[in-house]
């Protein structure tokens, strides 16, 4: 996913009220940016860190800037939780996730279950020889940024806060498998460091247990790492192992 326009660089003053971040731009201007992340953002909100903001072309928008990237030591991390869905959809379309490649259609934010929307729905057509189409594949995407291991290739943990909504998604994916469909959970590490994905059972033991149950029921899990380039964009560049919950 390439950025449509260059990002604006600055320094983080603070992130507060969940969805706001104060930033001093490189030209000295103080701005308040939209922080599209409802998590704790532990490990990716250190005051004084270099950050990059996108600028909205909409003159009527209340907050002109959106916080996209932060530098954490020598690594870069994306913080916008709206980004992973686009990055994963692009990776699927480009064949970067082989088990999810080759479907005829990719749709996003499709209603399913009782009141939910799936991030990505993959659908196939029947084969020319009248063989049945592959089952639909329901794909849920999670943003992963919490790093507590100081080693460059240490694990990145999920979640960074208790997520009852995330646990609900696991149950819904398992239900899709029970109905004869495929279901996949994709953990996207929006960081340039990290060598694996691990469940933060100390933060949310119910989610870690839920993932273990979902896997046992047939939900597929894919962990992916990203290149995060403030000058260009964010895209999938590596597969990562899951440390079993």
Swiss-Prot record:
* One annotated GO molecular function: DNA binding
The source's superkingdom equals Bacteria
What NCBIfam families does UniProt report for this protein, alphabetically? sfsA
What family is it from? Belongs to the SfsA family.
Protein name per its UniProtKB record: Sugar fermentation stimulation protein homolog
What organism does the UniProt record list as the source?
Rhodospirillum rubrum (strain ATCC 11170 / ATH 1.1.1 / DSM 467 / LMG 4362 / NCIMB 8255 / S1)
Per the UniProt record, the lineage of the source organism begins with: Bacteria, Pseudomonadati, Pseudomonadota, Alphaproteobacteria, Rhodospirillales
